[in-house]
Curated annotation (Swiss-Prot):
GO biological process terms on file: B cell differentiation; hematopoietic or lymphoid organ development; immunoglobulin V(D)J recombination; lymphocyte differentiation; protein-DNA complex assembly; T cell differentiation; T cell differentiation in thymus; thymus development
Cited CDD domains: PHD_RAG2
GO molecular function list: chromatin binding; histone H3K4me3 reader activity; phosphatidylinositol binding; phosphatidylinositol-3,4,5-trisphosphate binding; phosphatidylinositol-3,4-bisphosphate binding; phosphatidylinositol-3,5-bisphosphate binding; phosphatidylinositol-4,5-bisphosphate binding; sequence-specific DNA binding
Record-given protein name: V(D)J recombination-activating protein 2
Organism: Danio rerio (Zebrafish)
Domain notes: The atypical PHD-type zinc finger recognizes and binds histone H3 trimethylated on 'Lys-4' (H3K4me3). The atypical PHD-type zinc finger also binds various phosphoinositides.
């Protein structure tokens, strides 16, 4: 085992606890970014690239017929292998949005197309569920099982908000364990059935679920009602019979006391379990090998990598599996002054390094690294023994890598800034305060200072009526740090210069005809018409 520090290249602000890593068709994608997606990556999904000790993210696009997928923290993730003409995909259920709303939708994420110019397009499909639909939750697990030629999903555990009838202003954000029911989801028709087993008496969350054929094993977990982490192992056997499924549950007591752990696959139904917590204030620093076969579960302790002092002394850590026996671990940055990067990243490897990297193309007199070669035009690009999609990350192009410096500067007009020393707006736990707010907090402009600055109306303790009044008239506002007077000066009205109206001249207008007549003719004509 080895531990390698990584340097996040202009992407550290996107990572947050509760994110997910998806190993799809040989590529790894990051899902569940911090905050709502921005213009540079509206999908909120990034391709993960680790090379030469650097962590880079690349924005991924969706196909035109894709459904909207919000960024979700702590969802249930399941990998669906390609079978019966169906492509390889990931199933995503539940999770928390940046507004702390819980999702009850089921999404299917797959690769739609690959281009020769290193571009991957994903397709997201929202699956409609009917029957006993699982409620919105987070911290649960989703597993794919195969029994008697059929495929289904097993959903178990999680936390959710209190029922609407019991939810008040005081306990609005209070959560509890979901009922200990097991849900079976038919992926073809979206039918859901709930099953209550006598062996499962308490709900749990943040456990590890490992599936093999028609069995699912639940390791660890946290029971919120009793605030305990039982060291038990739950074996769930599912038979998808023609009439109704049969579920058999067995409770074993040789499990692990662990929550929020990372399961990194190292072989066929072989995993390394590490990370997470064994108590409220203690991380679990050990590594455990878990193997699944026809007999059952085999667990062995493995020597962990040599953790750094930053990891050992950090109170929290999180991460995800990169596939192929590797994982990504992040810890919060600590120090005085505060480091510019919010997190430190490490790559953990559980497999022995090979003597040399196998390359599909190379020459003894030339470099085998594709980054050392000048990029070819599309018309002259040649592939020797390689598929076009295998060159997906063969080179790093400046324009293809996500750079948070390319985003709009939100230091002055951003919604999630720290507007004052007592700022109450946290993008992770923010909820609408005013009736006019939907996805962003209401802000008001303070006219004091060099160029003025924006502050949150909630932090300034502005009543909603006064906020609406200030937004409708032309009054200046000064924040609490600059006097705290809602109305002190009136913005002078804009002086409008009078418009000078110049009469228009007609270009083709003719002067009236003047007749020269003698007085005798005038007298004759006057008598004639009289």
């Amino acid at each position: 085992m080895s531990l390698q520090p990584l340097t996040a290249v202009n992407c550290g602000s996107l990572v947050q606890p509760g994110f997910s890593l998806l190993d799809l068709e040989g590529d790894v994608y990051l899902f569940g970014q911090k905050g709502w997606p921005k213009r540079s990556c509206p999908t909120g999904i990034f391709g993960v690239r680790i090379k030469k000790g650097e962590l880079k993210l690349r924005a991924i696009s969706f196909s035109n017929n894709s459904s909207y997928l919000p960024p979700l923290r702590c969802p249930a993730i399941a990998h669906f292998e390609a079978q019966d003409g169906k492509p390889e995909c990931y199933l995503i259920h539940g999770g928390r949005t940046p507004n702390n709303e819980l999702s009850s939708s089921l999404y299917m994420l797959s690769v739609d197309s690959r281009g020769c110019n290193r571009k991957v397009t994903l397709r997201c499909e929202e699956k409609e569920l009917v029957g006993d639909v699982p409620s919105a939750r987070y911290g649960h697990t989703l597993s794919v099982i195969n029994s008697r030629g059929k495929t289904a999903c097993v959903l178990f555990g999680g936390r959710s908000y209190m029922p609407p009838t019991e939810r008040t202003t005081q306990n609005w954000n209070s959560v509890g364990d979901c009922p200990p029911q097991v849900y079976l989801i038919d992926l073809e028709f979206g039918c859901c059935t709930a099953h209550t087993l006598p062996e499962l008496t308490d709900g749990q969350s943040f456990h590890v679920a490992l599936a093999r054929q028609d069995c699912v094993y639940f390791l660890g977990g946290h029971i919120l009602s009793s605030d305990c982490r039982p060291s038990r192992l739950i074996r769930l056997h599912v038979e998808l019979l023609l009439g109704s499924p049969v579920l058999t549950c067995t409770i074993l007591h040789e499990g692990l006391t662990i929550t929020s752990a990372i399961a990194s696959p190292i072989g066929y139904h072989e995993y390394i379990i590490f990370g997470g917590y064994q108590s409220e204030t203690q991380k679990r620093m050990e590594c455990t090998y878990v193997g699944l076969d026809d007999v059952g579960v085999h667990m062995e302790s493995r020597e962990p990598p040599q953790w750094t002092s930053e990891i050992s002394h950090s109170r929290t850590w999180f991460g995800g599996s990169l596939g192929k026996g590797t994982a990504l671990v992040a810890i919060p940055s600590e120090g005085n002054p505060t480091p510019p990067e919010a997190y430190h990243f490490y790559q953990v490897s559980f497999q022995k390094e090979q003597d040399g990297e196998a390359t599909a193309q190379g020459c003894s007199q030339e470099s085998t690294d594709f980054e050392d070669s000048a990029p070819l035009e599309d018309s002259e690009e040649l592939y020797f023994g390689r598929e076009p999609h295998e060159l997906e990350y063969s080179s790093d192009v400046e324009g293809d890598t996500y750079n948070e410096e390319d985003e709009e500067d939100e230091s002055q007009t951003g919604y999630w800034i720290k507007c004052c020393l007592s700022c109450q707006v946290d993008p992770n736990i923010w909820e609408p305060y005013y009736s006019t707010e939907l996805t962003r907090p209401a802000m008001i402009f303070c006219s004091r200072g060099e160029g003025g600055h924006w502050v949150h109306a909630q932090c300034m303790e502005l009543p909603e009526s006064l906020l609406l009044q200030l937004s409708q008239d032309n009054s200046k506002y000064f924040c609490l740090d600059h006097g705290g007077l809602p109305k002190q000066e009136m913005t002078p009205p804009k002086q409008m210069l009078p418009v000078k109206r110049v009469p228009m001249k007609m270009t083709h207008r003719k002067a009236p005809v003047s007749l020269k007549m003698t007085p005798a003719k005038k007298t004759f004509l006057r008598r004639l018409f009289d």
